[in-house]
Regions:
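Rossmann-like AdoMet
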Residues: 1-89, 93-136
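Short, glycine-/aromatic-enriched active-site segment of Class I SAM-dependent methyltransferases
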Residues: 197-213
């Protein structure tokens, strides 16, 4: 298979940065991170690993990325316990394979992203039973019609590292429409405070020479999200780094101290939104 070349400074590069991070985490801690697919996928991608990605900041970033995927998988598994036939929808999927970690043999997966990302996904991952890849712009709500939603079965959406790049008014419109269209569903995504967006630009995006990409959306008060729509039943913020399981001592004292600060300060959050029941 010819390797897919990822050009630096593009949105497509965001496909590979978390992929490489999860690979690093898997290489170091194979007993606690379960994304075995990332190691295989990365062997088929042509990508220049920067010194920053392979250094200390890269190590911290890899742990954060792998932990984020663990968090998303945890929320999906919990939802599937009560809704075993639910749709599991990966918003801005890139090369993420979270569904393969939570698949119970009955749920149905939908992976959504821009056409070029879906093309790369199709080439590297191919089709799997009960998985559908949809090329779309999330802001074009016509993708709703491509989801075979059955209210009695339920639906859970997750988005990893996606909404930072959306303008707040677009996020509000999307969330409100989703809550109305998919009653009793659930949405989980990661977020930061407004102050955290500046750190993202300085440390991560510009550090990886992704200078043409901007970030907009942040969450300083999760209660604001609930007020966006009467179809949103609840919204809560959980710790990103130790909200779903304890930190591992092997990460190191300093790293864990930094992670605890990021959670406590809400610089790193996992947001869970429950959509109201119909009627």
């Amino acid at each position: 298979m010819e390797k897919i070349k990822i050009e630096p400074g593009t949105v497509q590069e965001t496909l590979v940065i978390p992929l490489y991070g999860r690979k690093q985490a898997m290489d170091r801690y194979p007993d606690i991170f379960m994304d075995h697919d990332c190691q295989e996928i990365f062997s088929h991608v042509s990508f220049q690993v920067s010194d920053q990605m392979s250094g200390k900041i890269g190590k911290i970033g890899s742990l954060m990325g792998a932990t984020r995927q663990f968090d998303m998988a945890s929320v999906c598994r919990t939802y599937l316990k009560d809704h075993p036939k639910a749709c599991v929808v990966n918003l801005g999927c890139g090369l993420d394979t979270t569904f393969r970690q939570v698949d119970n043999g009955h749920a149905r997966a939908y992976n959504l992203d821009f056409p070029d990302a879906i093309a790369a996904r199709n080439e590297l991952l191919g089709d799997r039973e009960r998985e559908t890849n949809i090329a779309c712009d999330l802001n074009d709500l016509s993708w709703f019609e491509q989801i075979d939603f059955r209210p009695e079965d339920g639906i859970v959406f997750f988005a990893s590292g996606v909404f930072y790049y959306f303008k707040t008014e677009d996020v509000k419109r999307l969330f409100s429409a989703m809550a109305e269209r998919f009653p009793s569903g659930k949405l989980v995504f990661d977020a930061t405070k407004k102050k955290g967006l500046k750190s993202m630009l300085k440390v991560w995006l510009k550090g990886f020479e992704m200078k043409d990409i901007s970030v907009y959306f942040s969450v300083d008060d999760v209660a604001v999200l609930k007020g966006w729509s009467s179809h949103i039943a609840s919204a809560q913020s959980n710790g990103y780094l130790e909200g779903y399981r304890p930190l591992d001592k092997r990460f190191g004292f300093i790293t864990n101290m930094v992670f605890r600060h990021l959670d406590k300060s809400k610089m790193c959050q996992i947001i869970e939104i429950d959509f109201a029941k119909k009627g």
